[in-house]
Amino acid sequence: MPFRRTLLAASLALLITGQAPLYAAPPLSMDNGTNTLTVQNSNAWVEVSASALQHNIRTLQAELAGKSKLCAVLKADAYGHGIGLVMPSIIAQGVPCVAVASNEEARVVRASGFTGQLVRVRLASLSELEDGLQYDMEELVGSAEFARQADAIAARHGKTLRIHMALNSSGMSRNGVEMATWSGRGEALQITDQKHLKLVALMTHFAVEDKDDVRKGLAAFNEQTDWLIKHARLDRSKLTLHAANSFATLEVPEARLDMVRTGGALFGDTVPARTEYKRAMQFKSHVAAVHSYPAGNTVGYDRTFTLARDSRLANITVGYSDGYRRVFTNKGHVLINGHRVPVVGKVSMNTLMVDVTDFPDVKGGNEVVLFGKQAGGEITQAEMEEINGALLADLYTVWGNSNPKILVD
């Protein structure tokens, strides 16, 4: 929803009810991206490749070969790519299941025309769960107390709520029932005994992207689900068992079970060896101007960089408020006209400086690639992760949620 329409809706709600509307998450856009004119006027933006996304979906579906259902994880506004941008591709490629985190994400998924299976992949607050009933969404349950509370909410609305019971098989210790203890097993049995909850799936989530660790967690999950199915007298044919995230889906095929939950792989975020998956996002900015400074000058806050020669520095219209973090100070590189140039001085809130002394063709208005490809050059996932000290998702979810997004190709 464009800002002006969001503001109008909020104003009308305030006038009519005397209260501001409540959102479980910020309103997300249903538009097919920011138009090109808006991007040209933005200090930084994200480009999302529809062709790369569709290629990745087809590649993954071919790898699953119909043996496991694909559930596309679109939490964090589709990992920063924009649910409103990616849902047409999800629907076009026949993906049967979508997973989200917030009610606002669920709203956009349903508003896009998706009528398939919709699952929340984290525990909801009770108010979220109640509000989420309108989206026909399956909920995660990981404790007997929460199950009783969810049951009461469903009963109050005259509904039966479909649930996925989360088990702590891999030691994530976040959402799941601890089936390694007898008290935990008793709790799991209580969850299956709620009148207004229908158990449709058993799931776990792997804590480490390591094949041996995944297999250990999978073995525990298999034992625990076998026990629960037997002692709760569940019909296995009516249950979906799922555990695999993107890493486990691609690297440990036996973990795929009935369904896989893939997010990163859909957008090209995989282990380096999986080159068949294409990156769906690029992060870009502009050169504002190029300045000349003499040798000996310092650059930026705290004088962390001193020019060793007379230099030409390009002023880039992006900073840490846009998700280009200060950790890239004196370490990062960007692409301008295909030239790989270094970040010099501290990254500021809205500005960074790069050294373009060796490239006289660089001028104000040039496009800058902060992450992605340009004219044969590339700012890679590996280098960004090494400097940032974290998974790339720690960066690109922020880029996508802090800057305008546009759908390309």
UniProtKB/Swiss-Prot annotation:
Which CDD domains does this one have?
PLPDE_III_AR2
Q: Name one GO cellular component term.
A: periplasmic space
Q: What happens when the gene is disrupted?
A: Cells lacking this gene exhibit a limited capacity for catabolism of L-Lys and L-Arg as the sole source of carbon and nitrogen. They don't secrete D-Lys in the growth medium. The stationary phase peptidoglycan structure does not differ between wild-type and the deletion mutant strains, indicating that products resulting from this enzyme activity are not incorporated into peptidoglycan under these conditions.
Q: What is the enzyme's class at the highest EC level?
A: isomerase
Q: What is its EC number?
A: 5.1.1.10
Q: Where is the active site?
A: K75, Y301
User: Know the name of this protein?
Assistant: Broad specificity amino-acid racemase
What organism is recorded for this protein? Pseudomonas putida (strain ATCC 47054 / DSM 6125 / CFBP 8728 / NCIMB 11950 / KT2440)
